[in-house]
Regions:
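Surface-exposed, interaction-prone regions used to assemble/regulate multi-protein complexes
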Residues: 1-130
């Protein structure tokens, strides 16, 4: 059964639609690398800080990348986009099982819910810099 766990960022777990803003998306296809840049609303972090905090997320060994506008995602019946925090790691999901079967890879399944979009990634690893 799938499990959802909030990712602990350098300023703690993030909650709320206004917690993460996404300003830049870059996919390097040949390197299987996805880079996301934007700002975090520090007041919505578990370890609250004043103002907005810039972030960079680098996902490596990306085998799955899906980005959907938030309001559209909330109207889809096949996904539970409303659960969890603003940045979650999901385990025991059908996506992970499919990738393991098709490519023999044991990856991470991550979901980032920003103000405007939801980004879902199946990757080997990631690094967050604040």
């Amino acid at each position: 059964m799938p499990q959802i766990k909030a990712v602990q960022t350098p300023i703690g777990a993030l909650y709320g639609r206004d917690a993460i803003y996404l300003d830049h998306v870059h996919m390097n296809y040949s390197k299987k690398e996805l880079v996301l840049k934007g700002e975090i609303n520090g007041g919505l972090a578990a370890e609250a800080t004043d103002g907005f905090v810039p972030y960079e997320l680098i996902f490596t060994e990306v085998y799955y990348f899906n980005m959907i506008e938030l309001d559209v995602a909330l109207h889809l019946s096949d996904r539970e986009y409303t659960q969890g925090s603003s940045f979650d790691e999901l385990t025991d999901t059908p996506l992970l099982a499919t990738i393991a079967s098709a490519r023999g890879k044991n990856l991470k399944h991550l979901m980032l819910k920003t103000y405007d979009d939801i980004v879902e990634i199946g990757c080997g690893d990631y690094k967050m810099t604040i």
